[in-house]
UniProtKB/Swiss-Prot annotation:
Gene Ontology molecular function: ionotropic olfactory receptor activity; odorant binding; olfactory receptor activity
Extracellular topology ranges: 28-34, 92-141, 231-266, 318-396
Name used for this protein in its record: Odorant receptor 49a
Family the UniProt entry places it in: Belongs to the insect chemoreceptor superfamily. Heteromeric odorant receptor channel (TC 1.A.69) family. Or49a subfamily.
Physiological role: Odorant receptor which mediates acceptance or avoidance behavior, depending on its substrates. The odorant receptor repertoire encodes a large collection of odor stimuli that vary widely in identity, intensity, and duration. May form a complex with Orco to form odorant-sensing units, providing sensitive and prolonged odorant signaling and calcium permeability. Involved in the behavioral responses to butanol and 2-heptanone.
Amino acid sequence: MEKLRSYEDFIFMANMMFKTLGYDLFHTPKPWWRYLLVRGYFVLCTISNFYEASMVTTRIIEWESLAGSPSKIMRQGLHFFYMLSSQLKFITFMINRKRLLQLSHRLKELYPHKEQNQRKYEVNKYYLSCSTRNVLYVYYFVMVVMALEPLVQSCIMYLIGFGKADFTYKRIFPTRLTFDSEKPLGYVLAYVIDFTYSQFIVNVSLGTDLWMMCVSSQISMHLGYLANMLASIRPSPETEQQDCDFLASIIKRHQLMIRLQKDVNYVFGLLLASNLFTTSCLLCCMAYYTVVEGFNWEGISYMMLFASVAAQFYVVSSHGQMLIDLSTNLAKAAFESKWYEGSLRYKKEILILMAQAQRPLEISARGVIIISLDTFKILMTITYRFFAVIRQTVEK
């Protein structure tokens, strides 16, 4: 029998993305030496992030250095939009971290901790599916491969030449730094900066999305439970007070879910708006770069990255769709229940719930775009059209 998931299981991956950067949202007690170690690593990653982000931005501003090379423009554009997405996510996360912490504590209080209640809530149904976890593992694996590939390739080329060939000093990112990275010590420093910067933007990008999926799935779980409870009730005029008390508890819990969903939109609204814009730009840049580069190692790497980024946004969109579906299912469950067997008072009160549940709960990008599978389809359609136009242009 499959193990029933605890609340800690739900937030484990999201929390781990930031803990591996040295940032602990929950401030878990630890020895002073370990605290200094992880805090120092977080400072290193943050400094590397802002330093290299400034270099990327400077390179984009210095347009003359990219002019005449579509490949360079798209590669720098790809790097810039991925960097921009991570910066916006990080800033949004840090600004709203206390509110996210409060939201997490509230959801933990509501989470069913007894095994019997966990079965009623069907907690495992709302945990990250096996396919979703595989998407996340593949995404992270692709990022690790792209981070280590330049160093491994440089070493292999040097070793094949038996030390006679020049060391190529390949780096993760093509960004020019303020020091010479083609000397041994400079290369080591540049690679440390590249690696910590790469880990920072990947973990922040993935970690914030995981947090959004975690809290939205918790709300979806409670909505699903309310719908099941509503469908199981058998009201009658003889048990009017008991039935109305039960219905009142469902209405109150639904109102609580509405408030929590507003908190989710407050914390992740700007993040999702930036995520949607930068993801579309990323996919278009990767599509173009793959066409230009053709079938080589770098082209394959960017094809893998394209699939990973698209899959990541699909997973986010599917959680938004799940919340929409389960929130509307509550009104459907109320309508399909045996409400007509209840008292007149019960019938009036269930109308309140039906009216309240008519409007679906949605994860929206600042109220502009609703995150759903339809949004994912629109995004992929735009990317494909861009890809088709670029391919025809290149072939000419």
